Amino acid sequence: MNSKKQAFMVSAMKSGSGKTLITLGLINIFKRMGKSISIYKTGPDYIDTMYHEKIAGSPSTNLDPYFLEPAFKPGELKRLFFRNFKNDIAIIEGAMGLFDGIYGEGKRCSACSVSEELFVDVIMIVDMDEFDNLFIYLQSFKHRVKAVILNKVGKNADINMIRLKVNEMGLFLIGYLQFDTNFYIESRHLGLYEPQKSIFDIVNNVSDKLSKTLDFTMLENFYVEEPHDTDIYNDKNIHNVDLNIKQNRYRLAFAFDEAFSFTYEENIKVLEEYGFEIVKFSPIHDKVLPDNISVLWLSGGYPELYAKELSSNISMLKSIYNTNIPIIAECGGFIYLHDFFEDGVGNKYPGVELIKGKAFKTKKLVRFGYIEIEAGSESILMKKNQRIRSHEFHYYDSTCNGEYAHAIKANKSKEWDCINASNNIFAGFPHLYLRGYEFLIQNLVSFLERERDV
């Protein structure tokens, strides 16, 4: 194979520099040119990938440097990137600042570490008023930065002079975007603002302006070489998917509506690889669970914004409460399973009543960040002492967080117990990522097989 394909990462010195907006503009520009784009986001963020998908019309893939850290899961990050790189161009949006990774551990698990693992060069998005800080910033660590796109450039800026300064750093200025108060997307905070219809107008305007300044010839020099090893594209070879398991189709009810929308595209793919038929349903709008299902999955989302609608759908609450199939619930789904849960202003609403206690709003993030989880006993997803990597990000807490597993932050600064796991339930605040942790689904299938044989 070993052919070259156009690919680059978009990064910045810090969050709020216009990375997402300019990434969306680039996606839109290439779409207008008739190019197909494979889109990625480093880190665990659900929201920016939603923006990518809105503009591109195709799924965006999370390349998480902690879940798939090479020292912990050798080869997984590279395998994921190339397996999903089926289009003309790959664009990776880096999370936060280029060197922002595990706190106190340098650039570990940063966007920079992803670019180095994949041998992908980086284009920095730099606000004009931050430009003078770029040179010093790039001295911090080794990197693959090759070019700059300037953001919020004033009408009277001397572009030729700026270009010379960029060249003196050993970089190229390949485009710029003039300042415009209309070029703004509300802060997403890893899940506080989903893309609205107005995003299309904003991105089209950005694309119009940016396309007039982009050096398309220079962009063609950003590429990655495909690997010789064709097995990198074949998950069955790597993960030993049991073909006998694939022949046994299980129907999995997957909550997906306004209240529950946070899931990784790779999770759906892994479930399908292991023989699950995904049946999407709405806890808000549907009256009962889908027919003939073997598993219920309640993903993360915004149940607090739809507390009244969820709690007033009594037939759905009863349908979930009375089911005896395995239930997996992450963060928002976990909140929904409580006896009671609060909306965003503290009003209390009835939940499914499978988790005894109350989920309640706090004034700050609770136990947030990357974590490594170790199981204390066997459950529907994990065996004793098995470990997975995960993350938590929530302003809610619970009177019943669970004690099934023990979580330790990535930098080992804090630790706590988490997850309720008994009989057929696996529910807690941690978000689950299945790629590289396929044993979770192998365990689930084994559980279903045992139950079927009883």
Spans of model-derived segments:
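Internal gly/pro-rich beta-alpha loop/helix module
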Residues: D129-N240
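A short helix->loop->beta-strand "cap" motif at the edges of active sites that frequently abuts
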Residues: V120, L171, N322-P326
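Cysteine-nucleophile active-site neighborhood
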Residues: P303-S379
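ATP-dependent carboxylate-amine ligase catalytic core
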Residues: N2-L21, I27-L118, V126-R144, N156-N160
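Structural motif
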Residues: M9, I91-E93, I123-I125, I149, ...
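Acyltransferase
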Residues: L192-N248, F256-F260, A421-V454
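C-terminal and late-domain segments of enzyme folds
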Residues: E53, I245-Q247, F260-V270, E277-V279, ...
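Phosphate-binding active sites in nucleotide-utilizing proteins
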Residues: N240-N322
